[in-house]
Structures are given as structure tokens and as C-alpha cells.
Amino acid sequence: MACTAKPACTAKPGRSPRSQPTRVQSLPKQVRKGGVDVLAAVPLSEETEFKVELFVKPVIGNAEGTTPHYWSISSPLKTAEAANVTPDADTTVCYSLSQVAPPDIPNQVSECDMLIWELYRMETEVLVLPVLNAGILTTGGVGGIAGPQLYFWAVGGQPLDVLGLAPTEKYKGPAQYTVNPKTNGTVPHVYSSSETPRARVTNEKYSIESWVADPSRNDNCRYFGRMVGGAATPPVVSFSNNSTIPLLDENGIGILCLQGRLYITCADLLGVNKNRVHTGLSRFFRLHFRQRRVRNPYTINLLYKQVFNKPADDISGQLQVTEVTMTEETGPLPPTVEGNVGVPTTSNLSHLPATVTLQATGPILNTQG
């Protein structure tokens, strides 16, 4: 029987043809952050969520020591600072630094992935007081604070990366306490991506007048800053406890604590009352962590070499030791044999395996006389 082709399917009058479902090709998506491949988040529970609260105090430099002053009011500004372009450290506000170590995660590492803590949201607020009587006592004048303001905070899995800048070509920063950027002394701003001074805030000696957060780095970090300028700007400071800050990026990933630490950096400048700099009394943080799976960047071979195959102690022993390989339980013979040992010496040397390596030069001899 001959095979006949089936007639084409035609739509009935008054009905539209059945639409075929659109096929969407799903491509594998690999998300990397902080140098690791990020996987799914662990569902929230009492064991997989962690919350911590802390207060971070303001920092003002110290002109006579190496420890910071946790003041909210600086020393009086000097009128000669404009000519000397070297301000006093007691009048310089520096970045405050703190760190949080979440608890250890049981069964954290497997062959394929590992569990880490992830900061996904937080609440923060600055503590302020109306400066009225304090202004009378410190300056002899009446009135609240005025002038420039700065509000800044940063949270990250590593210390904050900063750029070293100079407001003028002659500004060098305080001569004591603070860490000042090394510039060429001619250009006040960023002059090249490779020569601009860069650093990480690893202590509380970085002035807010010389260091600014680096937007080209800080991949595993979130920071926010707000500046209100003006010599006589009336400050407006609002504070509340009804704001939550999400810290997730476009892929839904927060701050990864890859080193088991979370670094917190902040600075709050309220203004100037006559000749004294006023800062916030403190900044409050409430941090919310959850667990996240990331691909294990360490192979079993690497762990074996770095952990198990590492000598426990370093010794200082004899040199010129030659490794000898034995084949078929036939041991090596000395290169020269004195006297007759059953058979001629040449016969014994001819039976040496090819894999035996003898100590040719500088043999180690134990002579007792």
C-alpha cells in the first residue's frame, strides 16, 4: 500500500490556530563575588540566622599619643592652621572602625561547597543631642552647631578600601597620629589610577579630610555617605528607628563574611560650633546575618598539601644525603670493595639495578679514631 502524505492541518473558520509554546533557552549563570562562586542561600531558622547590635564611638586624633580620643567635641581650632596647612590632630575627625565575628558554623566545609555568614540587612542611626549649653561652656557664645556635615557608614567582608586625596597642593594633614597619603605635592586630586595613594582602613588613624571610599573597589562592601556644606548652613539632623537598609545587590547577594569577620567603618560630623568640631555621640548598628552556600575554592589536594602534608617542625640536619631506590629487595653495594667477598667485585657491581643512585661525590663518613 502506497504511503500517502497527511493533509496539512487547517484552522476551522472563526477559530485562530493553536499557538505553539515559546521555548526559552535557560543559560547557566555563574555569580562571583569576593572571589568565590556564590550558590543558594540557606532557609532562615533559629540555627541559620544571627543578629548583633553594637555602638561605635566617634574618633578624634591625638596630638600627644598613639591612642585615639573618643570625643564628640574636638580641641579648639587654631587660626594659624591656614598658613601652616598642618592642622592639629586633636581637631581632626577620623574614621571609626569595628569588627564583628559571627559564631562558628558546624559542619561548615564539604568537598563541593562551604557555608558562610552573609549580612543581608541592617538598621543604623546616629545618636545626637541639641548643643546649647555645651556651646556656651566651650566657646563662650550662644547658639547651636553650624557649618559642614558628614554622615558616612560602610560594612564589608574586608576593611574599607580608600583613596588618598589632598584638598590643596600644600595640605599635608596632621603631623602626629594620623596616616597621611603620600602624594607628589603638586596635584590635589586624583591624577592617575595607578599612582593615586590607596589603602585599607585597618586602624582608626585615617582622617576624613584625606581619605575617601574607593568606588572602583569595595566589591564585597556597601557604603553610604551624605555631605551638607556651607559655612553657616543650619544643620538638619533627623533620626529614628523605623528604617531598614537592605544590603542585597542585583543578584540578591549581600555582604559575604569570607574571612569570618564583618568590618564596620563610620564617621559622623555634625558641624562646627564657633571654633570646635562636633561629631555624633555614637552610631548604632543592628546587623542581621544569614547563612549562604558558596563553592568550595579549596580542593582536597590543596588542603592536604597545606594542612596535613606540612612538616610540624623545622630542623637543621646534615646535607649531601642521596636518595637510594631499592628494586626487588636488592640493596646497593659500595662503589669500591676492599678484599675478597666471595665473588669478584666487578661481578657484584654488574648486578646493581639501573634505578640505584649511589652517592658519587662527598660521601658522609662516620670516622672514629
UniProtKB/Swiss-Prot annotation:
- Coiled-coil positions are none
Query: Which stretches does the entry tag as region Disordered?
Result: 1-28
Which Gene Ontology molecular-function terms are recorded? Answer: structural molecule activity
Q: Which GO terms describe its biological process?
A: endocytosis involved in viral entry into host cell; virion attachment to host cell
Q: Where in the cell is it found?
A: Virion; Host nucleus
Q: What keywords is this UniProt entry annotated with? A: Capsid protein, Disulfide bond, Host nucleus, Host-virus interaction, Late protein, T=7 icosahedral capsid protein, Viral attachment to host cell, Viral penetration into host cytoplasm, Virion, Virus endocytosis by host, Virus entry into host cell
Asked if Disulfide bond is a keyword of the record, the answer is yes
Could you tell me which cysteines form disulfide bridges? none
Q: Where is the composition biased (Polar residues)?
A: 17-28
One Gene Ontology cellular component annotation held by this UniProt entry: T=7 icosahedral viral capsid
Q: What InterPro entries does this protein map onto? A: Capsid_VP1_Polyomavir, dsDNA_vir_gr_I_capsid, Polyomavir_VP1_sf
Give the main location: virion
| Protein family according to the UniProt entry | Belongs to the polyomaviruses coat protein VP1 family.
> Oligomeric state and partners?
Homomultimer. The virus capsid is composed of 72 icosahedral units, each one composed of five disulfide-linked copies of VP1. Interacts with minor capsid proteins VP2 and VP3.
Task: Describe the task this protein carries out.
Answer: Forms an icosahedral capsid with a T=7 symmetry and a 40 nm diameter. The capsid is composed of 72 pentamers linked to each other by disulfide bonds and associated with VP2 or VP3 proteins. Interacts with sialic acids on the cell surface to provide virion attachment to target cell. Once attached, the virion is internalized by endocytosis and traffics to the endoplasmic reticulum. Inside the endoplasmic reticulum, the protein folding machinery isomerizes VP1 interpentamer disulfide bonds, thereby triggering initial uncoating.
Q: What is this protein called?
A: Major capsid protein VP1
Q: Where does this protein come from, organism-wise?
A: WU polyomavirus (WUPyV)
